[in-house]
């Protein structure tokens, strides 16, 4: 059967719950137009009263509202909160429902009603998990695909649609579709789910941001070990790039012995290659880096070296002139 709870605009299909739980259902909880063999509309009202008076009714209602909250945009959540706040207190509602059931002579339902309510709550909890998975993966892909289509259209046409419009139909057709697909009673004509064909609305942006943060957290947790391995590999390569202690000592000894002119000749480099076991390129790179380090650390010595070079160049020039 399909019944409609006025305060929350919830359409519940108990036949689906019965099928999910292996066919266990209350005798009056089948059919779509009323209770099968339950006495028509009066029997249906009695069944509603029995459900509302059941101890698990509040839990069932909470599970159903939780399903609605999963994919509802943030800007639409106050509608659900307002409808819940407008309900009478649970105790008063249960008392009124029990009184109505007693006045109508409705059966209590017994174990079959208890079984139905229990399985329905479990079914809704499972449905909520499926919705969360859908929002986390498929809805995110759909929203991003719409956004990419809008960007492509804008790049091709140069036209920028109005924020939140995304209209691809005439106003009459758009209003007709909105009136048929409203999610809540008293909707103002906007899309209840908030997913426009082109532009992202505020609710969509909130949903995208929430899904993005969840995916970011999951990816970070999933790739944490790989990031640690990569970091260790980088540090290992850095450590491997340093020269051994005895090799560096040999080069530094030569440097200190020739600190006034730390430019080894080709014969010096060949001898250092034999002593250290390094390649000629490594020797050249070490002396280049060592000279840079000493230039920055001892500017006075570098300036004196430059002055010596200038004097030697000047002397060479005078010799050439005299010659």
Curated annotation (Swiss-Prot):
Transmembrane segments: none annotated. SMART domains: ELK, HOX, KNOX1, KNOX2. The keyword DNA-binding applies. InterPro entries: ELK_dom (IPR005539), HD (IPR001356), Homeodomain-like_sf (IPR009057), KN_HD (IPR008422), KNOX1 (IPR005540), KNOX2 (IPR005541), TALE_homeobox (IPR050224). GO terms for cellular component: nucleus. One of its GO terms (biological process) is regulation of DNA-templated transcription. Residues 158-180, 291-323 are annotated as: Disordered. Residues 235-298 bind DNA. Isoform 2 is expressed in roots, leaf blades, leaf sheaths and flowers. Isoform 4 is expressed in leaf blades and at lower levels in flowers. SUPFAM superfamilies: Homeodomain-like (SSF46689). It is found in: Nucleus. It comes from the Eukaryota. It holds the Pfam family Homeobox_KN. Keywords: DNA-binding, Homeobox, Nucleus. One of its GO terms (molecular function) is DNA binding. Residues 214-234 form the ELK domain. PANTHER family: HOMEOBOX PROTEIN TRANSCRIPTION FACTORS. Belongs to the TALE/KNOX homeobox family. This is Homeobox protein knotted-1-like 11. It comes from Oryza sativa subsp. japonica (Rice).
